């Protein structure tokens, strides 16, 4: 019989997870969504301690739902960089667990404490 059987497909051992990280050279930051404002806007608490009003670009808005408590990557705007930004990426629960294990974010940051880099 040609082809692989269903049982041959699962991988044994360590699972490889590819997680995009914020590009610090572009000024990107980790953030946690605090409030959904409607019309594609969210209040996001960023790792530098500031709360920014962030926009969800159309390509992300159509592809995935964003909820309060989600961990995201924020790209601050060149103008009003302390107040506004764009959401670039949303992490899944598995990816957030990986970030916690690797020390990229802390539980304090997720629960509302300040994280300053």
From Swiss-Prot:
Residues 17-92 form the S1-like domain. InterPro entries: NA-bd_OB-fold, RNA-binding_domain_S1_IF1, TIF_eIF-1A, TIF_eIF-1A_CS. One of its GO terms (biological process) is translational initiation. CDD domains: S1_IF1A (cd05793). GO terms for cellular component: cytoplasm. Belongs to the eIF-1A family. Seems to be required for maximal rate of protein biosynthesis. Enhances ribosome dissociation into subunits and stabilizes the binding of the initiator Met-tRNA(I) to 40 S ribosomal subunits. This is Translation initiation factor 1A. It comes from Thermococcus kodakarensis (strain ATCC BAA-918 / JCM 12380 / KOD1). The gene is eif1a.
């Amino acid at each position: 019989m040609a082809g692989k059987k269903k049982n041959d497909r699962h991988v044994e051992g360590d699972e490889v997870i590819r997680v995009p990280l914020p590009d610090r050279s572009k000024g990107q930051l980790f953030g946690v969504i605090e409030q959904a404002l409607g019309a594609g806007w969210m209040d996001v608490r960023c790792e530098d301690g500031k709360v920014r009003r962030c926009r969800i670009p159309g390509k992300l808005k159509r592809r995935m739902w964003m909820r309060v408590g989600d961990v995201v990557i924020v790209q601050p705007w060149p103008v009003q960089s302390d107040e506004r930004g764009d959401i670039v990426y949303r992490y899944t629960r598995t990816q957030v667990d990986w970030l916690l294990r690797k020390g990229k974010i802390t539980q304090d940051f997720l629960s509302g404490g300040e994280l300053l880099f």
